[in-house]
């Protein structure tokens, strides 16, 4: 290859980098629920309609797998993780196997439940294995907070409502016309990503004898943006 040709190729390479860097500022990635699913999708419309009628809190789930069966060590670890999660300002509440009422072994009544007068795996004198068996066979708890094999449990993290996100969703067209939509969306994405980082740090600093899996729409949105950004960066470098 001649020196002149090398100079020309180098010139075009530098020019393309300048061009890309100039316009990349206007590139936005939206991984909200209404962008991950087509807004014209009938199932999504149906879900959104009933979500407005019967609102539920956004949630994340940490699945925890034991190398053997669920034991007292795991129960104690769940309690430690739950307390750390509950201290996060973004978290409304946490539900785990530790908070699940024992219903059948001690004939807990609806009145007992209403008065918060019930036993859990933390305060019960009933045999530990019997409690796990009840939970694993329960239509309420099975495959929710415990699996049939009794080696996987979960922590359900209910998140506080994000007033900015609700306002943005309800007034999307207005903010788009005002040119404010992507600025507010970026702030919301940043807050969500920070929350995911906090939760992952809690997991990393937990007992690594167990295996942890973090899931949920908020986590998926965060990861989608990260993956796409990394792919774009890699592609731009290759090109």
Regions found by a protein language model. Give the residues of each.
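Signature of alpha-helical transmembrane segments and their immediate interfacial
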Residues: 1-29
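Hydrophobic C-terminal alpha-helix "anchor/cap" residues
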Residues: 2, 85-86, 203
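Solvent-exposed, non-transmembrane loop/terminal regulatory segments of multi-pass membrane proteins
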Residues: 24-68, 75, 122, 129-146, ...
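Stable alpha-helical elements in mature extracytoplasmic
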Residues: 46, 74-77, 81, 90, ...
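Extracytoplasmic
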Residues: 52, 76, 125-239
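Short beta-strand elements
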Residues: 59, 89-101, 142, 208-215
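Short amphipathic beta-strand/extended segments in non-transmembrane regions
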Residues: 65, 79-106
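Charged, often glycine-rich, active-site loop that binds/positions anionic groups
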Residues: 79, 104-122, 225-233
């Amino acid at each position: 290859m001649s020196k002149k040709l090398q100079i020309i190729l180098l010139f075009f390479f530098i020019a393309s980098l300048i061009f890309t860097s100039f316009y990349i500022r206007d590139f936005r990635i939206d991984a909200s629920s209404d962008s991950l699913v087509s807004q014209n999708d009938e199932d999504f419309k149906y879900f959104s309609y009933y979500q407005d009628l019967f609102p539920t809190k956004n949630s994340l789930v940490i699945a925890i797998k034991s190398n053997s069966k669920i034991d007292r060590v795991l129960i104690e670890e769940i309690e430690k993780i739950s307390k750390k999660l509950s201290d996060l300002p973004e978290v409304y509440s946490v539900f785990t196997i530790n908070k699940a009422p024992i219903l059948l072994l001690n004939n807990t009544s609806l009145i007992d439940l209403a008065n918060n007068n019930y036993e859990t795996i933390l305060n019960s004198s009933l045999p530990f294995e019997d409690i796990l068996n009840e939970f694993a066979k329960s239509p309420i708890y099975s495959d929710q907070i415990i699996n049939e094999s009794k080696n996987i449990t979960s922590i359900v993290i209910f998140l506080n409502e994000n007033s900015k996100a609700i306002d943005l969703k309800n007034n999307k067209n207005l903010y788009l016309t005002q040119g404010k939509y992507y600025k507010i969306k970026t702030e919301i994405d940043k807050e969500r990503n920070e929350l995911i980082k906090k939760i992952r740090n809690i997991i990393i600093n937990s007992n690594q004898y167990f295996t942890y899996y973090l899931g949920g729409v908020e986590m998926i949105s965060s990861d989608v943006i990260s993956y796409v950004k990394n792919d774009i960066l890699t592609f731009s470098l290759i090109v």
